[in-house]
Amino acid sequence: MDKNNLTTGRKYLHHRRTVIDGIPREAERWLRCERITDTGAVFSRDYEAEITLNDQQIREELRE
């Protein structure tokens, strides 16, 4: 997704791949865009701490 298409207050699907104990895993979660910064954007999810994604992570991991 292009950072220029982000809208503050809107929810986006964050799709991420990671490795846990040597096993590749995929996870998805809905994040709300709180603010857009020069280097990326800040998102929140329910009661979790704010999540910062850089421009590359936004391009590769976010979906509408």
Regions found by a protein language model. Give the residues of each.
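Short, charged beta-turn/beta-strand-edge "cap" motif at the junction between a beta-strand
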Residues: 17-21
